[in-house]
From Swiss-Prot:
Protein name in the entry: Salicylate hydroxylase
UniProt keyword annotation of Cytoplasm present: no
Cofactor: FAD
Upper lineage: Bacteria, Pseudomonadati, Pseudomonadota, Gammaproteobacteria, Pseudomonadales
Molecular function (Gene Ontology), one example: salicylate 1-monooxygenase activity
Gene behind the chain: nahG
EC number: 1.14.13.1
Signal peptide (residue range): none
Length: 435
């Protein structure tokens, strides 16, 4: 056979980290014959820390675009009729008085993390995932990467995608390659008590306390000074996910003890004491006998997500606070963006630097804005915004439309811009799509 017609070897893509976005990316990429995908997970099996997770309309579009819509909708919850358009109702923490609602147009979409992960795992072909593989070192040798793992094994690839979480080992490699200092996660000063409540139990508690059962069915957010509480249903309404946030603003740069775990068991009394004076919302917390306490950390905005042939996605790149329900969604947007480009048969080892440059240029500014506004949103919830303060009417008005820019972001336009940079799409095609 003529060498010019010889089939090119498949591009070797290694994904380090098997959470929702890493697994979603692997599932999308492994469908393409020009890609050889391997997923490396440090744990002995796939698993997600946490319970319920909420997705905005933008994240749901990414899920569908990745070809995972059917798996998602089989396990996801939606706000029931006639409140199907509501994302959250906003209420005063002291007495649950109604302050307003945010209308997403598609309502709240939420899922138990473990359920969604299990649904994805069922579709992963054999031979893609390897477990107990914790990456410790990366060496670039020409156009090839050598990944070393703690167990002494190695893997050689053309592209490495780091989705290894907020404590990412690969982030140091990327930042050092850019001549930047290593960035550690930072404690936000906010902790969250988390628990899951049987919806029937919660209904009974609300009946006893004379609280409208509507608050069980529709996602709620109770707002107060230095704290807020959110609820939304999961597992087809059988369970209500509860997260109660409390913030200490006594230190301008709060720290968490280096030897203290980020997640620990807590007592109900400790949680109730943190929300003394919160009225009806305490009836909700009284249904959680053994909460867990989470010390919430995030990352500073990174100066870059890419070095050489290594790219960071998800929490490894932009770990953020949960106040906009956007962290997991941003990881899925990263996955969608890369899947649309890497899945093109014109992707090859020679144009990977250009492709990754487009990813960094087009995804990073948006993800950084989400990180930044998430912190601001938390201050708004807890009546600490420097302009709005405790003006509850104004808080409700702002929250009604605050997330529109996030939910309506046109990720396909970003992909089209990247394809234009790659020479894969003409200006006329983009104009036609936007017109």
């Amino acid at each position: 056979m003529n060498d010019m017609n010889a089939k090119k070897p498949a591009l070797r893509v290694a994904i380090v980290g098997g959470g929702i976005s890493g697994l979603a990316l692997a599932l999308s990429l492994c469908k393409h014959s020009h890609l050889n995908v391997q997923l490396f997970e440090a744990a002995p099996a796939f698993g997600e820390v946490g319970a319920g997770v909420s997705f905005g309309p933008n994240a749901v579009r990414a899920i569908v675009g990745l070809g995972l819509g059917q798996a998602y909708f089989q396990v996801a919850d939606r706000t029931p009729q006639p409140w199907e358009d509501i994302w959250f109702e906003w209420r005063r923490g002291s007495d649950a008085s109604y302050l307003g609602a945010t209308i997403a147009g598609v309502g709240q979409s939420s899922v138990h993390r473990a359920d969604f992960l299990d649904a994805l795992v069922k579709h992963l072909p054999e031979g893609i995932a390897q477990f107990r593989k914790r990456a410790t070192q990366i060496e670039q040798q020409g156009d090839e990467l050598q990944v070393l793992f703690r167990d002494g094994t190695e893997y050689r690839c053309d592209l490495l995608i780091g989705r290894d979480g907020i404590k990412s080992a690969l982030r140091s490699y990327v930042l050092e390659g850019q001549g930047q200092d290593h960035l550690e996660p930072r404690f936000s000063g906010t902790c969250a008590y988390r628990g899951m409540v049987d919806s029937l139990q919660l209904r009974e508690a609300y009946r006893i306390n004379g609280i409208d059962e509507h608050l069980v069915d529709v996602p709620q957010m109770y707002l107060g000074l230095y704290g807020h509480i959110l609820t939304f249903p999961v597992r087809k309404g059988r369970i209500v996910n509860v997260v109660a946030f409390t913030s200490d603003r006594s230190q301008p740069e709060p720290t968490w003890p280096a030897d203290a775990p980020w997640v620990r068991e807590a007592s109900q009394r400790e949680m109730l004491d943190a929300f003394a004076g919160w009225g009806d919302a305490r009836a909700l917390l009284e249904c959680i006998p053994a909460p867990t306490l989470w010390a919430l950390h995030d990352l500073p905005e990174l100066p870059g997500y890419v070095h050489g042939r290594v790219a960071l996605i998800g929490d490894a790149a932009h770990a953020m606070l949960p106040h906009q329900g956007a962290g997991a969604g941003q990881g899925l947007e990263d996955a969608y963006f890369l899947a649309r480009l890497l899945g093109d048969s014109r992707t090859e080892t020679g144009n990977l630097p250009e492709l990754l440059g487009a990813y960094d240029d087009l995804r990073r500014p948006h993800a950084c804005r989400v990180q930044r506004t998430t912190v601001e949103t938390g201050e708004l919830y807890e009546l600490r915004d420097p302009i709005v303060g405790a003006d509850e009417q104004l808080v409700g008005e702002i929250l009604a439309t605050r997330f529109d820019w996030l939910w309506n972001h046109d990720l396909d336009a970003d992909v089209a811009e990247a394809r234009l940079r790659m020479g894969w799409e003409a200006h006329e095609q983009i104009a036609l799509r936007q017109g």
